[in-house]
Every structure is written in structure tokens, then in C-alpha cells.
Amino acid sequence: MFLIYLLVQTAESSWLSKTAKKLENSAKKRISEGIAIAIKGGSRRRRSVGEEDAIPSHIEVNKFFLRKPAKEHI
């Protein structure tokens, strides 16, 4: 039973260390990108899903929000 425990601990710590390393590399990359953009004087790129065009530009806003709801099919 103890051997199984040791094997599981080793596998889990290996997975955690790989995941932590990936997160660390990702953070370093974002920081270096931000520094490069700041040095160039460009605008900051934001990594947010909310910045995507939530309402397609070809739809009028009033028509989009004031449209009638679809009827339910039972």
C-alpha cells in the first residue's frame, strides 16, 4: 500500500511541477511582451474575451435589444 502511495505522490508532484513551469513561462512571456510594447510606446493589448465584438457590427443595436423573443416550441 505504501508503494502505491509513493508512486501516486511522485506522479502527482511531477504533473504539478510541469503545470507550474508552464504557468511560469506563460507569465514571463506576457511580462516580456508588455515591456516590449511599453518600450515601443504602442497601445497595450488586453487578453480578455469581453473585448471581442459582443454584438456583430452589421446589426443595429436597437433592433438587437428590442427584438421579440422567439416562441417556444413544445
From Swiss-Prot:
List the GO terms this entry assigns under cellular component, sorted alphabetically. Answer: extracellular region
Cleaved signal peptide residues = 1-13
Its GO biological process terms?
A: antimicrobial peptide secretion; defense response to bacterium
Q: Which family does the record claim for this protein?
A: Belongs to the cecropin family.
Q: What is the native source organism of this protein?
A: Ascaris suum
Q: Propeptide spans which residues?
A: 45-74
Highest taxon above the source species: Eukaryota
Q: Which UniProt keywords apply?
A: Antibiotic, Antimicrobial, Secreted, Signal
Q: In which tissues is it expressed?
A: Expressed in the body wall, intestine, uterus and ovary.
What subcellular compartments does it reside in?
Secreted
Summarizing the function annotation, the protein's role is: Has antibacterial activity against several Gram-positive and Gram-negative bacteria. Is weakly active against yeasts. Acts by a nonpore mechanism.
Q: What induces it?
A: By bacterial infection.
Name of the protein described by the UniProt record: Cecropin-P3
